[in-house]
Amino acid sequence: MKDFTEEEAFEKMTAWCSTAERCRSEVSEKLQRWSVSYAIINKVIERLIDGGYIDEERYCRAFIRDKYRLEKWGKQKIAKALYVKRIPQHIFDTQWDVIDNDEYQSILHKLLQSKRKSIHTNDDKSLNEKLIRFALSRGYDYKDIRQHLDISEELEENEWEM
């Protein structure tokens, strides 16, 4: 692998960061794959931040918006993905306003309706269990899922005890 100077690494990263929003960890991982030294990686990242190529808040807003609208992810899954990308929690906690609550609930409702059509069972309990697991895997909150499935707390407690 070629040894990159700071300037070469910076030029490559400015080009790469210009194509889409990137975060510190993505840039760092890419430079590490190229065997760039940690000292150079840190300098390049600082220069990218100073130049406006990397902005964690801007990245976070775009990430939340894209995963929510395009992938139909729930808030829990988005938060976990941002944690994996090492975005500080105080940054993504302030960015949830990108998600309109009514639209969020509408997307969950449509996902559950669509999934319901693909599940072949006559048992309501089994159907609800499968829908709950599906929506939880997509990162939606249990209370929101239950609300869309019209499961009352009393009925739910009785079903799970059987």
Question: Can you describe what each PLM-predicted range is?
Answer:
Residues 1-162:
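An alpha-helical, amphipathic repeat domain used for nucleic-acid recognition
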